[in-house]
């Protein structure tokens, strides 16, 4: 696994974020908040995670909001982020193998803790296949 993994959420993802930190104690988490179930704005926390990756504090990140949709959209507004929304292990694996995703988004109201844990483990331990997928990922930089 990686040295540090950034994790951030809004209020809809707070419970799952905390559960993942307990379920995966061997991960060196860089917790960027939020730190309660009080209502906050997901773009703020997607931005904090994107900034941490850009600064080299973490190579990959996990983002969680209620559905995973809003926070993934916000993350992908940052040019150096390739955020994929996944609610199953297949999506978590393929976003690494084919798309070299550096951020995994999930919905705290959409996915159970056990599946989320599996998704994070697969995401962190799957390598990018490169090859024919590399030219496609390279084209993302010109969008």
Language-model features and meaning:
Residues 45-63, 67:
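Short, structured active-site "lid" loops
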Residues 28-39:
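A short beta-strand-loop structural module common to alpha/beta enzyme folds
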Residues 6-8, 12, 89-143:
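C-terminal binding/interaction regions
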Residues 63-109:
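Mid-chain, well-packed structural core segment of small domains
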Residues 2-20:
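N-terminal beta1-alpha1 ligand-phosphate binding loop
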Residues 2, 57-59, 100:
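Short, high-confidence coil segments that cap the C-terminus of an alpha-helix
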Residues 44-47, 86-88:
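Charged helix-capping and loop-helix junction motifs
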Residues 19-27:
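A short, Lys/Arg-enriched amphipathic alpha-helix followed by its capping loop at the start of a domain
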